């Protein structure tokens, strides 16, 4: 059953990425903020649904406790969506999704989580591989456009500077995940954090 849920999650994640890319209009300098607001609205609706249907007794003080973590996640989304205006999804998405490996390293280093040598090697390999994949893919895409004498879309002319957006997303999102682990280690219930 877990495999079915994993497949559904991957499909939903990929579909969401396509909608984020479609909504990132390079001509609208605020398009990424509109996406952040819509994602926040959907998450707020989800929180209200959970509150109304699950019988959880929510403690509002947890909203203040969890605010720095939420701020990191919101900032990472804004940076990631802003970057979609300048990069192809096939370049930005792998870099952004390396945040899980980075947060694994952070929890290992700072929170004393255990990690075997092989796990440590795998996390490092994934992180380096994902970043190199996007760098090489961008170079190949630029070379292909030049070879085919295609006009380079204005939004893709920023090159290496545009890679700062998905890298920024990965770093900020990994800090958010690390902060999640830290808050949970200090005793906050996951459901309280989810609603916050």
Predicted segment positions?
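Juxtamembrane helix-loop boundary signature in multi-pass membrane transporters
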Residues: 1-8, 101-171
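Loop-to-transmembrane-helix transition segments
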Residues: 2-9, 48-51, 55-79, 158-171
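Hydrophobic/small/kink-forming positions within alpha-helical transmembrane segments
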Residues: 10, 14, 18, 48, ...
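C-terminal ends of transmembrane helices
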Residues: 15-28, 74-91, 131-141
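Juxtamembrane helix-loop-helix junctions in multi-pass membrane proteins
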Residues: 15-42, 56, 172-196
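Cytoplasmic-side transmembrane-helix entry/capping segments in multi-pass membrane proteins
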Residues: 28-38, 88-99, 122-123, 159-168
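Membrane-interface helix termini and inter-helical loops of multi-pass transporters
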Residues: 51-63, 108, 112-117, 177-192
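Specific alpha-helical transmembrane segments that line the substrate/conduction pathway
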Residues: 68-73, 81-133, 192-196
């Amino acid at each position: 059953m877990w495999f079915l849920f994993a497949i559904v999650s991957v499909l939903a994640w990929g579909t969401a990425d396509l909608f984020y890319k479609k909504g990132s209009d390079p001509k609208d300098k605020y398009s990424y903020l509109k996406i952040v607001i819509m994602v926040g609205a959907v998450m707020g609706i989800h929180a209200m649904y959970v509150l109304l249907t699950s019988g959880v007794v929510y403690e509002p003080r947890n909203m203040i406790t969890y605010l720095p973590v939420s701020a990191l996640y919101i900032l990472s989304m804004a940076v990631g969506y802003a970057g979609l205006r300048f990069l192809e999804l096939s370049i930005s998405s792998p870099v952004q999704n390396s945040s899980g490996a980075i947060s694994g390293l952070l929890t290992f280093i700072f929170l004393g989580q255990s990690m075997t040598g092989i796990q440590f090697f795998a996390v490092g390999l994934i992180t380096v591989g994902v970043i190199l994949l996007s760098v090489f893919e961008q170079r190949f895409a630029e070379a292909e456009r030049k070879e085919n004498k295609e006009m380079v879309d204005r939004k893709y002319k920023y090159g290496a500077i545009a890679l700062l957006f998905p890298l920024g997303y990965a770093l900020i999102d990994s800090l958010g995940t690390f902060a999640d682990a830290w808050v949970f280690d200090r005793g906050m219930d996951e459901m309280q954090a989810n609603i916050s």
